[in-house]
């Protein structure tokens, strides 16, 4: 059984027990979070497709960690002008573990 859900501006395909990195959710480590924007659930019996979301479906996940991604280096450069600008960025993300995928018919 797998599901596709949307959080932030991205979509993720998950199965129960999977650990994934998503955009930052402002909750503490150890809390559970529920996702209601489910686009698709594929169980062994049948396939449920939302339009755009499945109304009676939900995904429950546990927050494992809040951390920062690797640093991205940004360099701006203009030739022959002796202009160089260096900047870095570290994106925040949340690591979650999918506890259960539920759907009521």
From Swiss-Prot:
MF GO annotations: rRNA binding; structural constituent of ribosome
Disulfide bridge positions per record: none
Domain of life: Bacteria
Keywords recorded for this protein, A-Z: Ribonucleoprotein, Ribosomal protein, RNA-binding, rRNA-binding
GO cellular component, one term: ribonucleoprotein complex
Gene Ontology process terms (BP): translation
Keyword Lyase attached: no
Pfam families for the chain: Ribosomal_L21p
Family per record: Belongs to the bacterial ribosomal protein bL21 family.
Stored HAMAP family: Ribosomal_bL21 (MF_01363)
Function: This protein binds to 23S rRNA in the presence of protein L20.
Subunit structure: Part of the 50S ribosomal subunit. Contacts protein L20.
Protein name in UniProt: Large ribosomal subunit protein bL21
Gene that encodes the chain: rplU
């Amino acid at each position: 059984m797998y599901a596709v859900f949307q959080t932030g501006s991205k979509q993720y395909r998950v199965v129960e027990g999977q650990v994934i990195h998503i955009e930052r959710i402002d909750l503490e480590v150890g809390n559970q979070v529920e996702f209601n924007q489910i686009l698709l659930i594929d169980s062994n019996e049948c396939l449920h497709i939302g339009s755009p979301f499945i109304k009676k479906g939900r995904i429950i996940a546990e927050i494992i960690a809040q951390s920062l991604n690797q640093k991205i280096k940004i360099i701006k450069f203009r030739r022959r002008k002796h202009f160089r600008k260096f900047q870095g960025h570290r994106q925040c993300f949340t690591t979650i573990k999918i506890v259960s995928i539920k759907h009521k018919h």
